[in-house]
Amino acid sequence: MTEPARKPAAPRRVIRVREVATADFPAIIALCERTYPGAPPWSEKALSRHLEIFPEGQFVAVERSGMIYGYAACLIVNWDDYDMGDSWRDFTGGGMFTNHDPVLGRTLYGAEVMVDPTIRG
């Protein structure tokens, strides 16, 4: 009995995760537009604020070509300041991360994770 022919595997992408740089902002905004069509993307002002407040918590997933295929944004919060019913806006200071609290906070809050819809598996 012969096995059915297998479809050749697509070439694997080499993706590297690194911290966000200001030069990434246009690509992050474009990624946001592809990921959430019709919704307002992150603004350069908000992305810049995230970098000012907590650069170690902002990441991009980049292909060797330089194309950005993923983005993650985090901040540290003091969980005791929040209730489970609080909104994303409450946890993120309206998306500006003004409530980032590296002194009293012990919880890394994932405010955003997006992956380009063209490469999702």
Language-model features: locations:
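Glycine-rich acyl-CoA binding loop
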Residues: 112, 120-121
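Helix-loop element at the rim of GNAT/NAT acetyltransferase active sites that forms part
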Residues: 30-43
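Glycine-rich phosphate/pyrophosphate-binding loop shared by adenosine-nucleotide-utilizing enzymes
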Residues: 13-15, 66-71, 108
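Short acidic N-proximal helix/loop "leader" segments that mark the beginning
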Residues: 1-12, 91-94
